[in-house]
From Swiss-Prot:
The keyword Transferase does not apply. One of its GO terms (biological process) is translation. SUPFAM superfamilies: YhbC-like, C-terminal domain, YhbC-like, N-terminal domain. Required for maturation of 30S ribosomal subunits. This is Ribosome maturation factor RimP. HAMAP family: RimP. The gene is rimP. Belongs to the RimP family. Transmembrane segments: none annotated. GO terms for cellular component: cytosol. It comes from Delftia acidovorans (strain DSM 14801 / SPH-1).
Length: 192
């Protein structure tokens, strides 16, 4: 059985989602897991988001060590972890889950003539808010205005930069990740 299948069956069999498998030099096998996501129910109670714990990683590690040994998989070290604050977005469900979040997006090809002179035609990387597009696809909305630094005074006369939007499909993406924005005030429940 292929390594991908063994890992996927083991992780999903224990009730987790497989986010990513990575093989590195030196025999490192890195497995990234997450808890399954359930869309919020309209009018239902706001359920705080669950996060992967060390105990979850430990449970997966033990089971994977056994499964990989039985199959004779070649690896030196096994590392199981959560996706972290810069979680990769790969599947439609990931994008649905993180609508309204700030993401970093890299396209396979530059946007070219579609830029219509508003941004560089060679641009491939964007950071903005993920939104559902009207046609059922996805879009990222951003402003090229520099962020206001803490303590910086902003002129009342300053005109804010206009918001820009870029529609995209999953096939056009090289990579999409949650933007690593750190808030030291603690986690708060997302409004539904």
């Amino acid at each position: 059985m292929a390594l991908q299948q063994i890992v996927e069956q083991t992780v999903t069999g224990l009730g987790y989602d497989l986010v990513e498998i990575e093989r590195s030099a030196g025999g490192l096998l890195r497995v990234t897991i997450d808890l399954p996501w359930q869309p919020p129910v309209e009018g239902g109670p706001v359920v705080p988001e669950q996060f992967v714990t060390v105990e979850d990683c430990e449970k997966i590690t033990r089971q994977l060590q056994f499964a990989l040994e039985v199959d004779g998989a070649d690896y030196t070290r096994l590392e199981v972890s959560s996706p972290g604050i810069d979680r990769p977005l790969r599947h439609e469900q990931d994008f649905t889950r993180f609508v309204g979040e700030v993401i970093d997006l890299t396209l396979k090809e530059p946007i070219g003539a579609a830029a219509e002179g508003q941004v560089s035609a060679n641009r491939k990387k964007f950071r903005g808010t993920l939104e559902r597009a009207e046609d059922g696809g996805w879009q990222i909305v951003w402003s090229d205005e520099p962020p206001v630094k803490p303590g910086q005074k902003v002129s009342k006369k300053r005109v804010p930069a206009p918001l820009q939007a870029l529609g995209f499909t999953l096939e056009e993406l090289r990579e999409a990740r949650l933007a690593p924005i750190v808030d030291f005030k603690g986690r708060s429940a997302k409004p539904v």
